[in-house]
């Protein structure tokens, strides 16, 4: 049976126990033009100066928050009920969608009818929503009609992170090298609309996922992080995957992909979506393959189509579709050192060879678009021929597939379906800029979403590092979202600790890229932490860090038992050799001399 909320999170309340950033932080909400636009942020309040002085200056720093109600002490979260449907009123007031009388997917109806006592089913049976006759419900469609939706206003507030409230000291920032990005000092709802209308950004928010807090993926916005979870035929259960999702967003996952390939895929996904405040992505071909007993040759358009509808009606926000794997590219892929390393790519390759014809993902793409626009499912056009080794980087198969993805992007845009493009993979550092340039050239500026790339193949067990190195460079060049890699990459299914390490490594990469691009306000957090470090405000340093618990734990473990945490040194230099302590004493001495 599904475990209770407190058994998964470690607390009887709605707040996740030991949440990232609880040290010196609190959750706040910024209200928009209407009371139901409430944007969550982390507020870090820091006292600057002597703690016993009444005139102590307070610095407030606001950070992007992906953790949803799970970190709100005032929220009574129950995973058996799911999260509040915060977007439901926005969806209903547009009057362009309808609630269906039953599920449209045959498989979905079968799963509902086949429920047995004791099964791990989400308690609430909800009816899905889809576009009304002749209507298009995508955020791109609204944007192209000149409509600024509540989702767009929500995103503008979220991306700005209350930069206007920063003290001047923290606003100082190096210009950066934007490399073609176009970032205004203030993100407005109209700017969000314009970027979505042009296809340069996507808002992955299915109308059947009203629990989703709107976010945006685009090269002119903050770099985002995706975390992969999902069971396999060999390990994991539904409650473990829900736990991993909550854990992933706690550490900063902007989106989560459920890549389950084991049993109970439908039920696992329902639990995850109903409890997720971030967009959920999937690779539908995985579940379609399960439906035919793992035999790729037995796949059909009819089974895949039903799977798309099933998942869209559950609320999946974006689909990875490997429609760029064309039969004419298979020979080039066979010449590689490591062949085809994408699961979706290899599945469709096997199908194409068995049937001697083009992939139905490509030939039926117009019909796939019709499904997507009825629910506002964003496409993540999969790189089924991405290089799986440095040896194969930027080869013919990869680049020719990219051209096909550009063709499919234009097809999707004719339907006002939102699109992002998946990228490699394994690419050495000196070839990363070329990857970005080719993506922009062939895919018309659609957001790039890359798996790293890993910049070397020699680090099994440390591939979260090789990926973060490549991800930093690729995001600086223009990638909009990085898919995290964990230490278990190439080795096995990640656990909670792997998820944490993978996300933190890629949050570092994303932030470093924002700094390099000169993203407005990106340096404020660095400035605040540096000031706290120079003033030996240890708790403030921890609060501003990406992993406060780890930093605090390391310091505590290294201090002598009788030492207080107010000491103005660490065990690296000790009390007599700390350069910052010496510098401070010199400053204080100089100031005292001037007063005399």
UniProtKB/Swiss-Prot annotation:
Q: How is the cofactor bound?
A: Binds 1 [4Fe-4S] cluster per subunit. The cluster is coordinated with 3 cysteines and an exchangeable S-adenosyl-L-methionine.
Entry binding sites for Zn(2+): 426, 490
Example of a GO MF term: carbon-carbon lyase activity
User: Where does this protein hold substrate?
Assistant: 228, 257, 286, 322, 342-344, 383-386, 422, 449
Q: What class of enzyme is it?
A: lyase
* Residues that bind [4Fe-4S] cluster: 570, 573, 578
What is this protein for, i.e. what is its function?
Answer: Catalyzes the synthesis of the hydroxymethylpyrimidine phosphate (HMP-P) moiety of thiamine from aminoimidazole ribotide (AIR) in a radical S-adenosyl-L-methionine (SAM)-dependent reaction.
What family is it from? Belongs to the ThiC family.
Q: Which NCBIfam families match?
A: PRK09284.1, PRK13352.1, thiC
Stored PANTHER family: PHOSPHOMETHYLPYRIMIDINE SYNTHASE, CHLOROPLASTIC, THIAMINE BIOSYNTHESIS PROTEIN THIC
The UniProt subunit note reads as follows:
Homodimer.
Instruction: Spell out the protein name for this chain.
Output: Phosphomethylpyrimidine synthase 1
Q: Source species, please?
A: Syntrophotalea carbinolica (strain DSM 2380 / NBRC 103641 / GraBd1) (Pelobacter carbinolicus)
């Amino acid at each position: 049976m599904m475990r209770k909320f407190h058994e998964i999170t470690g607390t009887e309340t709605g707040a996740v126990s030991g949440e990232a950033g609880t040290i010196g932080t609190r959750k706040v909400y910024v209200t928009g033009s209407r009371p139901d636009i409430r944007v969550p942020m982390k507020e870090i309040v820091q006292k600057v100066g002597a703690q016993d002085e009444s005139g102590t200056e307070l610095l407030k720093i606001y950070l992007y928050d992906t953790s949803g109600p799970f970190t709100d002490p005032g929220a009574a979260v129950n995973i058996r009920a799911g999260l509040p449907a915060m977007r439901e009123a926005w969806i209903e007031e547009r009057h362009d969608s309808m609630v269906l009388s039953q599920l449209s997917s045959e498989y979905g109806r079968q799963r509902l009818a086949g429920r047995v006592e004791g099964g791990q089913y989400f308690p609430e049976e909800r009816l899905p929503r889809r576009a009304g006759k002749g209507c298009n419900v995508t955020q791109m469609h609204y944007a192209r009609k000149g409509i600024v939706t509540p989702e767009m206003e929500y995103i503008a507030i979220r991306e700005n992170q209350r930069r206007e409230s920063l003290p001047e000291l923290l606003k100082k920032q190096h210009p950066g090298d934007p490399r073609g990005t176009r970032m205004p000092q203030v993100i407005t709802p109209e700017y969000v609309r314009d970027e979505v209308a042009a296809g340069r950004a996507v808002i992955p928010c299915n109308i059947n996922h009203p629990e989703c807090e709107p976010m945006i993926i685009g090269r002119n916005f903050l770099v985002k992080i995706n975390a992969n979870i999902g069971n396999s035929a060999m390990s994991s259960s539904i409650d473990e995957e829900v736990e991993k999702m909550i854990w992933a967003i706690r550490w900063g996952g902007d989106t989560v992909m459920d890549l389950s390939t084991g049993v109970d895929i439908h039920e696992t996904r329902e639990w995850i979506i109903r409890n997720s405040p971030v967009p959920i992505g999937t690779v539908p071909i995985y579940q379609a393959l399960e439906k035919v007993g793992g035999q790729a040759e037995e796949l059909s358009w009819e089974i895949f189509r039903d799977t798309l509808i099933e998942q869209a009606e559950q609320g999946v926000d974006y689909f990875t579709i490997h429609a760029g794997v064309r039969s004419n590219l298979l020979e080039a892929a066979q010449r590689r050192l490591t062949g085809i390393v994408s699961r979706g790519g290899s599945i469709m390759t096997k199908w194409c060879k068995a049937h001697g014809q083009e992939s139905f993902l490509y030939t039926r793409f117009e019909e796939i678009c019709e499904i997507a626009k009825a629910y506002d499912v964003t496409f993540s056009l999969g790189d089924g021929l991405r290089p799986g080794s440095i040896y194969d980087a930027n080869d013919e198969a990869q680049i020719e597939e990219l051209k096909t993805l550009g063709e499919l992007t234009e097809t999707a845009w004719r339907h006002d379906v939102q699109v992002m493009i998946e990228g490699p993979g394994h690419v050495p550092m000196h070839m990363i800029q070329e990857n970005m340039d080719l993506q922009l050239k062939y895919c018309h500026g659609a957001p790039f979403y890359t798996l790293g790339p890993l910049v070397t193949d020699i680090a099994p067990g440390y591939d979260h590092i090789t990926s973060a190195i490549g991800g930093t460079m690729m995001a600086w060049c223009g990638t909009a979202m990085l898919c995290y890699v964990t230490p278990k990459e190439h080795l096995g299914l990640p656990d909670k600790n792997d998820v944490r390490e993978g996300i933190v490594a890629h949050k570092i990469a994303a932030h470093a890229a924002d700094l390099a691009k000169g993203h407005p306000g990106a340096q404020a957090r660095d400035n605040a932490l540096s000031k706290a470090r120079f003033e030996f405000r240890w708790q403030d340093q921890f609060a501003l860090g990406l992993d406060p618990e780890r930093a605090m734990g390391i310091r505590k473990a290294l201090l002598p038992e009788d030492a207080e945490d107010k000491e103005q040194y660490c065990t690296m230099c000790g009390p007599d050799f700390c350069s910052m302590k010496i510098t401070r004493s010199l400053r204080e001495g100089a100031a005292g001399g001037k007063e005399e």
